[in-house]
UniProtKB/Swiss-Prot annotation:
Gene: Eif2ak3
GO biological process, one term: regulation of fatty acid metabolic process
Record note on quaternary structure: Forms dimers with HSPA5/BIP in resting cells. Homotetramerizes in response to endoplasmic reticulum (ER) stress, leading to its activation. Interacts with HSP90B1/GRP94. Interacts with DNAJC3; inhibiting EIF2AK3/PERK activity. Interacts with ATAD3A; ATAD3A and EIF2S1/eIF-2-alpha occupy a common binding site within the cytoplasmic loop of EIF2AK3/PERK, leading to prevent EIF2AK3/PERK association with its substrate EIF2S1/eIF-2-alpha. Interacts with MFN2. Interacts with TMEM33. Interacts with PDIA6. Interacts with LACC1.
Transmembrane residue ranges: 511-531
Domain Protein kinase: 589-1075
Domain-level remarks: The insert loop specifically recongnizes and binds EIF2S1/eIF-2-alpha.
Organism: Mus musculus (Mouse)
Keyword line: ADP-ribosylation, ATP-binding, Endoplasmic reticulum, Glycoprotein, Kinase, Membrane, Nucleotide-binding, Phosphoprotein, Serine/threonine-protein kinase, Signal, Stress response, Transferase, Translation regulation, Transmembrane, Transmembrane helix, Tyrosine-protein kinase, Unfolded protein response
GO molecular function: ATP binding; eukaryotic initiation factor eIF2 binding; eukaryotic translation initiation factor 2alpha kinase activity; identical protein binding; misfolded protein binding; protein kinase activity; protein serine kinase activity; protein serine/threonine kinase activity
Ranges where the record places region Disordered: 72-92, 775-827, 1087-1114
Documented effect of changing K618A: Loss of protein kinase activity
Stated name of the protein: Eukaryotic translation initiation factor 2-alpha kinase 3
InterPro entries: CC_SR_Kinase, Kinase-like_dom_sf, Prot_kinase_dom, Quinoprotein_ADH-like_sf, Ser/Thr_kinase_AS, WD40/YVTN_repeat-like_dom_sf
Native organism taxonomy: Eukaryota, Metazoa, Chordata, Craniata, Vertebrata
Length: 1114
C-alpha cells in the first residue's frame, strides 16, 4: 500500500512540469491579451480604421520606449515595470510647481518634451509604438487625372484641381463615412473609419502609466504610482480612407493620417474622469493652490517667447525685449503638433498664427469680436508638405470647422444652388523662407515638382518636404482667405504674459519679424531715394550747359546790353508753352545722332518707325521773308526733281512750326553726343549777313568789306577786329561764334570753312560757307567774342579792312552766358558792325590780282556795342523749320578720303578716274535738267556702302536761266555774279564767280577740273595744297603731274580755261578717251543705272538706302 501510494520519480517529474507550466501561464496572460487587440479591432470593424501598416503597430503599444535625457530623470524605461517599483521618490524633485514643458508631436509618431526653463534641453522622448501619423499608397498625381486628393492630418481631405488651380475640401468626412459609404466617382467607392488610443504619461518623467483603447486598458505600476504626480493624457486619433472598386471590391488606394491631442490632469484627479467627461478643471483646492504657486513663479518666464517653425522642424525661444535668441532645438522629422504645459494648463501652439497669444482664457467682453476677427484674418491657412513621398496638409482649426458634416447638404455641390459651399483655398502658395523672394508657384511648376519626387521615400525621411526644394524648400503655405497674408514667416509665437495688464493685449506683433527683411527694406529705401532724386533733377532743374572750350572766350558787352538780354531771355522762358504740340519728326522718326551741319541746315541720322530704315533728316530754319524763304525752298525743289544714282536721293519734305523755345530745348537733348560738338541752336539761313566788297581785288590787304543784313529794321551793329596767330586742325569743331583757323603762314587742314557763319547756331544762321576775306581758303580762327584780358583785343598797326554785319542771324551772339537754348531771339534784331579787321602781311600789292598763297590775315578783334537801344527790341515771330528726308550715305566724304591717302601709292589711278567719272555723270545729269550746282568741292561728294559716289548739298543749286531781279533786292555780293548768295567755296570757284561777272553752268566744269587734279595729285600738307591749287588755277601745273599724266593734264587744262566758252561740256568729259582705255568694274552698269532709274523715279523712290548719312558740305 505504502509502496503503491508512494510517488515515483516519474510522478515527481510530472508534478514539477505542471508547476512550471502554471507559473508560465500566469506570466503569459498579459502578452496574450495584448496580442488579441489587433484581432479584436479587426473583427469589430476598427481594423478598417487602420492602414495596412498600422494593423501591426497596436501590439507595439505594450512595449513603448521612454528615453529620459534629463540628468535628473530616472534611467528606467516605460516598458520595464519591474524597475519602476524600486525607484526612489525623485519624481517629486523632477516636477517643481513652476516648471514649464514644451510638448512636441512629430510625424513619426514620437512625443518629446523640452524644458523651457533649462535652455530647451530635452526632458524625455517617448515612442508609443503606434507608427507614423501619415502613411499612404497614393504616390502619383495621375491617379485622379487633373484632380488630386491630399489628406490632412486631422482626417479631412482636400481636392486639388489643376485646371482651376484651387484647393477645396472633399465633400465628406471620416465621421460621415462611418454612417454610410460615399461614392466618389463612377468607379470608386470610399470607405473609412477612425480609432482612438489614449496614453497616460507622467508629466515630468515621461513614464508610460497606462494605455486605453476600444479593447480595454492596460496599466503599469499602479500600486507604486504617486497620487500627487501630474498626468499627461495623449489621445491619438487615427483616420483611414480606402478606395475600392464598386464591382470587384479590389482596393485601389488607401491612406491613413493621425494626430495627437494633449490633456493635463494635475495631482489627485482620477484618470477615468477624463474618459467619462467628469473632469472639471479648477474643481478642488489643490488646483487653487497650484494657481497661486504659478503667480509666485511667473517672473522666471517674464520675457520668454516660444516659437515653432514647421518648415525648419525647430522650436526656438526668444527674449521679448530685443528679440535675442535664447535657445533652439531642431528635430529630425516634421512637427505635427506643439503644446506648452505650464502649471496645470495646456496651451496649444498654433501652427498658423504669426503673432503672439496669451495664456489667458478669460473673456474680454467687447474686445471678443475684434479678437475673433483678427484670428480669422490670419489663422485661415493650410500648410502643404511631404513625408516619405506622400503629400499631406496641416490645416488651421478655422478651416476644419467650415467643413460640412452632413452628406445631404452636399447633394448639389456641383450645381449652382449648393446648400453649403465647400471651403476653397486659392492656389497662391507662399514660400516658407522669409529670407528668399516670395514668388508664386504655378500649377505647371507644382506638377513638375511632383514628378521629380518619385524617389522621395525612406531615404528622404529626414528631409520631410523633399518635393519642395530650393527655391520652394520645405513646403508651401496656402492662404485660405481672399486677401493674401502680408507676412511670409511660418514661425508661431507664444508669449508668457505675467503682469495683469497684459491680459487685455491678446495679440501683439512679433518684434523681430521685420529683421528678416532688413535687406529688402534697405534696398527699397535706397531705390526710392535714387528715383526721387532723378525725377526732381529731370523735371525741376535745367540741363547742365556745355563747358566752354579753352579757345572760347567770354563776350564783352556793356552792362546795359547784358541786363536787357537777360530780361528778354527770362521773359521768353516764362512764356514758353509746350503743351499740345506734336512734332511729325519725332512721331515718324527715332533720332539716332546729329551727323553734322552745312548747306543751310543741320543733318540728323534718324530711324523711320515704320520701315526701320535709317535716313538723313536735314532741318532748315526758314526765314520770315517770302523772297528769302523761296531761296531756301529752291533746294527742296531741286532735290525733288533729281533722280540719278550719282545724286543723294530725296524722299520727302515737310514744314513744322514748334512753339517758342521748344526746338532749342529739343536740341539740347538731341545734341548731347560729344562726337557731334555742334552748337545747340542754328541761325536762320536767310538772316545771314550779306558781304559787299568795295574793291574789285577781293584779296587785297586793304580791301573794305561790308556785310549788310537784308532786314532794314535791324539797326544794332558791332565791330570786330579779328586776330590771327592760332592754329587748328581739320577736325576742329565749331562752337557758337567760333571759327577754327591758322596763322598767316601756318598749315591748316580745313580749306572749306574759312568764313563759315552758316551754323554758328543750329537753328538760326545761314551757311555763308567759305566766303573768306583773304586768299587762304583754309579755315581761320575767328573768335567774335574774346575776353578783355586777351592780348588780341588791342588794336595793332597794319593794314585793315572794315566788315560791317547788319545782322549775323544770332542777335545775342555776344551773350554767351545765357543757356544754349536761349541764345537766339529772332525778335531782337541788331545791326552788327565789324571793324578793325587787321592782320599783318608781308605780301605786296602786286599779288592782289591773283590768289595769294599766303594771304593777309586779320590781327585784332574787338566788339563795339554802341547803338543798342531797348526800344528796338521787338517780339519774335514763330519759327518755321523745313525738314528734308534724304538718302543716308557714309559719313566719310571725298575730302576725308583724300586726306587719308597722301601719297601716289595710296591712290590707284583707275580708282581715282572711276570716282571722277561718277561725279562727272552726276554733273552732266544736273546740266541736262537745266541746273547747276555752283558749289562742287570734295566735301560735297559722298559715298554709299557699295562705294557709289553721290553728289550732295544742293543748297546753292539754281536754274541756269534764273531771273536776275533778285540782285536788286538781296544784293548778297554785289561785286560777284547775280546768282543766289554767291557764297560757293572760293578755292574751287571759277574766275567769273570771283570777279562778280555773269556765269553759266561752266562754273561746275571749272570745279570738276580742280577736283580731278586733286584726285590724281596728292598733297602732304594743307599749305602745299593751297599753294599748288592756286598755281593750277593759273594753269601752272607741277612737272611731275604733266610727265606722269599727259592726257589728264590736257583735260584738266581745258577744264580750267579762264574763258567759260573754251571749257568742255560735261558730256564731252564723260566721253573722253582716258575713260575708254580703262577697265574697272561698274562703269557700264553705272551708266545703265543712270538711264533706267531716271525714267522710273517713282519705283526707285520706294527703295531707301539703310547705310550712313551724308555730311553736307562746309
Amino acid at each position: 500500500m505504502e509502496r503503491a501510494t508512494r510517488p515515483g520519480p516519474r510522478a515527481l517529474l510530472l508534478l514539477l512540469f505542471l508547476l512550471l507550466g502554471c507559473a508560465a501561464g500566469i506570466s503569459a496572460v498579459a502578452p496574450a491579451r495584448s496580442l488579441l487587440a489587433p484581432a479584436s479591432e479587426t473583427v469589430f470593424g476598427l481594423g478598417a480604421a487602420a492602414a495596412p501598416t498600422s494593423a501591426a503597430r497596436v501590439p507595439a503599444v505594450a512595449t513603448a520606449e521612454v528615453t529620459v535625457e534629463d540628468a535628473e530623470a530616472l534611467p528606467a524605461a516605460a516598458g520595464e515595470p519591474e524597475s519602476r517599483a524600486t525607484e526612489p521618490d525623485d519624481d517629486v524633485e523632477l516636477r517643481p510647481r513652476g516648471r514649464s514643458l514644451v510638448i512636441i508631436s512629430t510625424l513619426d509618431g514620437r512625443i518629446a518634451a523640452l524644458d523651457a526653463e533649462n535652455d530647451g534641453k530635452k526632458q524625455w522622448d517617448l515612442d508609443v509604438g503606434s507608427g507614423s501619423l501619415v502613411s499612404s499608397s497614393l504616390s502619383k498625381p495621375e491617379v485622379f487625372g487633373n484632380k488630386m486628393i491630399i489628406p490632412s492630418l486631422d482626417g479631412d481631405l482636400f481636392q486639388w484641381d489643376r485646371d482651376r488651380e484651387s484647393m477645396e475640401a472633399v465633400p465628406f468626412t471620416v465621421e460621415s463615412l462611418l454612417e454610410s459609404s460615399y461614392k466618389f466617382g463612377d468607379d470608386v467607392v470610399l470607405v473609412g473609419g477612425k480609432s482612438l488610443i489614449t496614453y497616460g504619461l507622467s508629466a515630468y518623467s515621461g513614464k508610460l502609466r497606462y494605455i486605453c483603447s476600444a479593447l480595454g486598458c492596460r496599466r503599469w505600476d499602479s500600486d507604486e504610482m504617486e497620487e500627487e504626480e501630474d498626468i499627461l493624457l495623449l489621445q491619438r486619433t487615427q483616420k483611414t480612407v480606402r478606395a475600392v472598386g464598386p464591382r470587384s471590391g479590389s482596393e485601389k488606394w488607401n491612406f491613413s493620417v493621425g494626430h495627437f491631442e494633449l490633456r493635463y490632469i494635475p495631482d489627485m484627479e482620477t484618470r477615468a474622469g477624463f474618459i467619462e467627461s467628469t473632469f472639471k478643471p479648477g474643481g478642488n483646492k489643490e488646483d487653487s493652490k497650484i494657481i497661486s504657486d504659478v503667480e509666485e513663479q511667473e517672473a522666471t518666464m517674464l520675457d520668454t517667447v516660444i516659437k515653432v517653425s514647421v518648415a525648419d522642424w525647430k522650436v526656438m525661444a526668444f527674449s521679448r525685449k530685443g528679440g535675442r535668441l535664447e535657445w533652439e532645438y531642431q528635430f529630425c522629422t516634421p512637427i505635427a503638433s506643439a503644446w506648452l504645459v505650464r502649471d496645470g494648463k495646456v496651451i496649444p501652439i498654433s501652427l498658423f498664427d504669426d503673432t503672439s497669444y496669451t495664456a489667458s482664457e478669460e473673456a474680454l467682453g467687447d474686445e471678443e469680436d475684434i479678437v475673433e476677427a483678427a484670428r480669422g484674418a490670419t489663422e485661415n491657412s493650410v500648410y502643404l508638405g511631404m513625408y516619405r513621398g506622400q503629400l499631406y496638409l496641416q490645416s488651421s482649426v478655422r478651416v476644419s470647422e467650415k467643413f460640412p458634416t452632413s452628406p445631404k447638404a452636399l447633394e448639389s455641390v456641383n450645381g449652382e444652388n449648393a446648400i453649403i459651399p465647400l471651403p476653397t483655398i486659392k492656389w497662391k502658395p507662399l514660400i516658407h523662407s522669409p529670407s528668399r523672394t516670395p514668388v508664386l508657384v504655378g500649377s505647371d511648376e507644382f506638377d513638375k515638382c511632383l514628378s521629380n519626387d518619385k524617389y522621395s521615400h525612406e531615404e528622404y525621411s529626414n528631409g520631410a518636404l523633399s518635393i519642395l526644394q530650393y527655391p520652394y524648400d520645405n513646403g508651401y503655405y496656402l492662404p485660405y482667405y481672399k486677401r493674401e497674408r502680408n507676412k511670409r514667416s511660418t514661425q508661431i509665437t507664444v508669449r508668457f504674459l505675467d503682469s495683469p495688464h497684459y491680459s487685455k493685449n491678446i495679440r501683439k506683433k512679433d518684434p523681430i519679424l521685420l529683421l528678416h527683411w532688413w535687406k529688402e527694406i534697405f534696398g527699397t529705401i535706397l531705390l526710392c531715394i535714387v528715383a526721387t532724386t532723378f525725377i526732381v533733377r529731370r523735371l525741376f532743374h535745367p540741363q547742365p550747359h556745355r563747358q566752354r572750350k579753352e579757345s572760347e572766350t567770354q563776350c564783352q558787352t556793356e552792362s546795359k546790353y547784358d541786363s536787357v538780354s537777360a530780361d528778354v531771355s527770362d521773359n521768353s522762358w516764362n512764356d514758353m508753352k509746350y503743351s499740345g504740340y506734336v512734332s511729325r519728326y519725332l512721331t515718324d522718326f527715332e533720332p539716332i545722332q546729329c551727323m553734322g551741319r552745312g548747306g543751310f541746315g543741320v543733318v540728323f541720322e534718324a530711324k523711320n518707325k515704320v520701315d526701320d530704315c535709317n535716313y538723313a533728316i536735314k532741318r532748315i530754319r526758314l526765314p520770315n521773308r517770302e523772297l528769302a524763304r523761296e531761296k531756301v525752298m529752291r533746294e527742296v525743289k531741286a532735290l525733288a526733281k533729281l533722280e540719278h544714282p550719282g545724286i543723294v536721293r530725296y524722299f520727302n519734305a515737310w514744314l513744322e512750326t514748334p512753339p517758342e523755345k521748344w526746338q532749342e530745348e529739343m536740341d539740347e537733348i538731341w545734341l548731347k553726343d560729344e562726337s557731334t560738338d555742334w552748337p545747340l541752336s542754328s541761325p536762320s539761313p536767310m538772316d545771314a549777313p550779306s558781304v559787299k566788297i568795295r574793291r574789285m581785288d577781293p584779296f587785297s590787304t586793304k580791301e573794305q568789306i561790308e556785310v549788310i543784313a537784308p532786314s532794314p529794321e535791324r539797326s544794332r551793329s558791332f565791330s570786330v577786329g579779328i586776330s590771327c596767330g592760332q592754329t587748328s586742325s581739320s577736325e576742329s569743331q565749331f562752337s557758337p561764334l567760333e571759327f577754327s583757323g591758322t596763322d598767316c603762314g601756318d598749315n591748316s587742314d580745313s580749306a572749306d570753312a574759312a568764313y563759315n557763319l552758316q551754323d554758328s547756331c543750329l537753328t538760326d544762321c545761314e551757311d555763308v560757307e567759305d566766303g573768306t576775306v583773304d586768299g587762304n581758303d583754309e579755315g581761320h580762327s575767328f573768335e567774335l567774342c574774346p575776353s578783355e584780358a586777351s592780348p588780341y583785343t588791342r588794336s595793332r598797326e597794319g593794314t585793315s579792312s572794315s566788315i560791317v554785319f547788319e545782322d549775323s542771324g544770332c542777335g545775342n551772339a555776344s551773350s554767351k552766358e545765357e543757356p544754349r537754348g536761349n541764345r537766339l531771339h529772332d525778335g531782337n534784331h541788331y545791326v552788327n558792325k565789324l571793324t578793325d579787321l587787321k592782320c599783318s602781311s608781308s605780301r605786296s600789292s602786286s599779288e592782289a590780282t591773283t590768289l595769294s598763297t599766303s594771304p593777309t590775315r586779320p590781327t585784332t578783334l574787338s566788339l563795339d556795342f554802341t547803338k543798342n537801344t531797348v526800344g528796338q527790341l521787338q517780339p519774335s515771330s514763330p519759327k518755321v523749320y523745313l525738314y528734308i528726308q534724304m538718302q543716308l550715305c557714309r559719313k566719310e566724304n571725298l575730302k576725308d578720303w583724300m586726306n587719308r591717302r597722301c601719297s601716289l601709292e595710296d591712290r590707284e589711278h583707275g580708282v581715282c578716274l572711276h570716282i571722277f567719272l561718277q561725279i562727272a555723270e552726276a554733273v552732266e545729269f544736273l546740266h541736262s535738267k537745266g541746273l547747276m550746282h555752283r558749289d562742287l568741292k570734295p566735301s560735297n561728294i559722298f559715298f554709299t556702302m557699295d562705294d557709289v559716289v553721290k553728289v550732295g548739298d544742293f543748297g546753292l543749286v539754281t536754274a541756269m536761266d534764273q531771273d536776275e531781279e533778285e540782285q536788286t533786292v538781296l544784293t548778297p555780293m554785289p561785286a560777284y555774279a547775280t546768282h543766289t548768295g554767291q557764297v560757293g567755296t572760293k578755292l574751287y570757284m571759277s574766275p567769273e564767280q570771283i570777279h562778280g561777272n555773269n556765269y553759266s553752268h561752266k562754273v561746275d566744269i571749272f570745279s570738276l577740273g580742280l577736283i580731278l587734279f586733286e584726285l590724281l595729285y596728292p598733297f602732304s600738307t594743307q599749305m602745299e595744297r593751297v599753294r599748288i591749287l592756286t598755281d593750277v588755277r593759273n594753269l601752272k601745273f607741277p612737272l611731275l603731274f604733266t610727265q606722269k599724266y599727259p592726257q589728264e593734264h590736257m583735260m584738266v587744262q581745258d577744264m580750267l580755261s579762264p574763258s567759260p566758252t573754251e571749257r568742255p561740256e560735261a558730256t564731252d568729259i564723260i566721253e573722253n578717251a582716258i575713260f575708254e582705255n580703262l577697265e574697272f568694274p561698274g562703269k557700264t552698269v553705272l551708266r545703265q543705272r543712270s538711264r533706267s532709274m531716271s525714267s522710273s523715279g517713282t519705283k526707285h523712290s520706294r527703295q531707301p538706302s539703310c547705310s550712313y548719312s551724308p555730311l553736307p558740305g562746309n
